[in-house]
A protein has these predicted regions:
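ABC-type nucleotide-binding domain
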Residues: 351-592
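Hydrophobic alpha-helical membrane-associated segments
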Residues: 48-52, 56, 86, 90-103, ...
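An intracellular "coupling" helix at the cytosolic face of ABC transporter transmembrane type-1 domains
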Residues: 33-34, 127-128, 144-153, 157, ...
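Cytosolic ends of transmembrane helices, especially the final helix of ABC transmembrane type-1 domains
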Residues: 229, 236, 260, 307-335
Length: 592
């Protein structure tokens, strides 16, 4: 399995480009640099498999000349030409299959690799990046843009490269037979280049506009789906429908303008090439009239010119799709080359995290905010201690938890874990020592068993059952027809809030973590569910360093220490009874 994953990771190809801009075509070559051999083999087999179209033109001309000028040719030539064309046509079956096979291997691998690399990069990007980037837009990049890049790759390998091969061979054959006719053919190139340059910038901009509108629409649809319970509860369905309709209207209008521009491009190229084809017919006929060629040669050159027109037309016809593909390449670079990754780059891997924390003058400010949400925050926590943070909304409680998890990095001050600066720790190793239970825990689509053992496929049944018992979850499992193998639905939608919380606690327990983080873990529960979850949490917290954020002050009564926060600073600290005895800020919060 590890080998498969490594071959799908293109991250190294973009390491030196982080934070820079890379041209789409350069990006495409990076993606295919490990598949040059496959591309070369597909081009070779295309050249062989496509040979009938060139040979048939020559054979047709030869047959016409043989029957038109019997005094100059023998019937032996007739039969040789027939044998050649039959053999050349039959070989198309194996060579065409090999041509497509090599293309498919390369394209399928790049498509899977690009999606895998985007997902890897998303896992590395900071939470602030994900906060700024709508999930629907990211989904659009991974699905729609990669699909467009896949289509671009196929157009390049199955249209552009074959067309280029056709042009080289046909012009070469024409040059071999008549340099005058070859020169006439080459005159078509400047007009083709002019057409592309004339339409290129307009098509690129309109494709960009359409792509951005589709990303915005994807974000709106994603948000609308998530908000259905709220909108329905308030009777605001029409408001959401109008929002999506407005986004769709923008896509419709800009898409229509793009379609019209592509129509102008297609019709202009068709008119130009038809005029050239008429010119070729009269030019070669005039040369035959002067005695420079035989009648069959007119047919051959006309056939060659049709091939040239077909090749150039195929390039120009797919050009709008190429523009879309290159715009999608530009789109994925917004993710692949982003520098907004997690800031911690430490490499230290302690054997075991004990759970001692020291915050020294820590300060943090959110992007776009004009004040520090934490200011000179200082605190020391002993291993196995339970510390609860309370205070008004915006006082910095949840920010502290995000700093402990490593989602954020202090702008100033330091955090030490077991005496080691947090910046020197490997975040992956450190987070394996954490368990987090949130107010709204995310469950994955799947069974209860899969959610509890997430990331631990080889956990023993004994440990699993122990975690279920400690999480007070057994009665829930016994009440379900499929027990542990019951599907929870999307985001756990088939379960109650209390049931989801206990599954989250079981998921934490089965990992045997050293540090527990509880963020409003019971605030959304009714009294009965809260009692069950509270009992499970007590099992979870035993002997472990625990950080709690809660608005219900009754839930922090048993904490070893309660830290009262206000405007990013510690204003009180002590046990529940000590703080009540002070009759300070905690006392006020308790009596609100």
């Amino acid at each position: 399995m590890a080998k498969v994953e490594s071959t799908l990771d293109y991250s190294e190809a973009f390491e030196t480009e982080q934070g820079t801009k890379i041209k789409p075509f350069k990006l495409l070559t990076r993606l295919y640099r490990d598949h040059v051999g496959k591309v070369a083999m597909s081009a070779l087999y295309y050249t062989i498999k496509a040979s009938p179209i060139w040979v048939l033109s020559i054979v047709t001309a030869n047959i016409i000349n043989i029957v038109s000028y019997p005094d100059r040719h023998s019937m032996r030539e007739f039969w040789i030409n027939l044998a050649v064309i039959v053999v050349v046509i039959i070989q198309n079956i194996p060579t065409h299959t090999l041509h497509i096979s090599y293309i498919s291997k390369a394209v399928r691998h790049v498509e899977a690799g690009l999606r895998s690399t985007l997902v890897r990069k998303m896992q590395q990007l900071s939470l602030s990046y994900h906060g700024d980037m709508n999930a629907g837009r990211l989904q659009s990049k991974i699905l729609r843009d990669v699909e467009a890049i896949d289509f671009l790759s196929r157009q390049m390998l199955m249209t552009i490269i074959p067309a280029a091969i056709n042009l080289i061979i046909v012009i070469g054959l024409t040059l071999y037979n008549s340099w005058i006719v070859a020169l006439f053919f080459v005159l078509m190139a400047p007009m083709s280049i002019f057409l592309v340059r004339f339409f290129r910038s307009k098509m690129s901009q309109r494709n960009r506009d359409v792509r951005r509108n589709i990303e915005e629409m994807s974000g709106k649809v994603s948000e609308t789906v998530e908000m259905i319970p709220v909108t329905r509860a308030h009777g605001l369905e029409e408001v959401e429908i109008r929002k999506v309709d407005s986004a769709l209207q923008n896509i419709r209008e800009k898409g229509h303008r793009l379609d019209v521009l592509e129509a102008y491009f297609g019709s202009s190229s068709w008119v130009v090439f038809q005029l050239f084809q008429v010119g070729c017919l009269f030019f070669t006929a005039y040369l035959a009239h002067l005695g420079y060629m035989e009648i069959g040669d007119i047919v051959m050159y006309q056939s060659f010119f049709n091939m040239i027109i077909g090749s150039v037309s195929s390039i120009l016809n797919v050009y709008p799709n190429l523009v879309k593909g290159f715009e999608s390449l530009h789109s994925v670079t917004e993710v692949l080359l982003s520098k907004e990754t997690e800031e911690y780059k430490g490499r230290k891997n302690p054997e075991r995290i004990q759970g001692a924390y020291r915050f020294e003058g820590v300060g943090f400010q959110y992007k776009g905010s004009d004040r520090h949400v934490l200011d000179e925050f200082t605190l020391e926590v002993k291993p196995g201690e339970t510390v609860a943070f309370v205070g008004e909304s915006g006082s910095g409680k949840s920010t502290i938890l995000n700093l402990i998890i490593g989602f954020f990095k202090p702008q100033f001050g330091n955090i030490y874990i077991d005496g080691i600066p947090m910046s020197e720790l490997s975040m992956r190793k450190y987070r394996q020592s954490l368990a987090i239970v949130l107010q709204n825990n995310i469950l994955f689509s799947g069974t209860i068993r899969e959610n509890i053992t997430y990331g631990l496929p080889h956990i023993s049944e004994e440990k699993l059952q122990q975690a279920i018992w400690m999480a007070n979850l057994q009665d829930v499992i016994d009440s379900l027809p499929d027990g542990l193998d019951t599907s929870v639905g999307e985001h756990g939608g088939r379960l109650s809030g209390g049931q989801r919380q206990r599954i989250a606690i079981a998921r934490a327990l089965v990992r045997d973590p050293q540090i527990i983080i509880l963020d409003e873990a019971t605030s959304a529960l009714d009294n009965m569910s809260e009692r069950h979850v509270q009992q499970a949490m007590e099992q979870l917290m035993k002997g472990r360093t625990t950080f709690i954020v809660a608005h219900r002050l009754s839930t922090v009564k048993n904490a070893d220490r309660i830290v009262v926060m206000k405007k990013g600073k510690v204003i009180e600290s002590g046990s529940y009874d000590e703080l009540l005895g002070m009759k300070g800020e905690f006392y006020k919060l308790k009596n609100l």
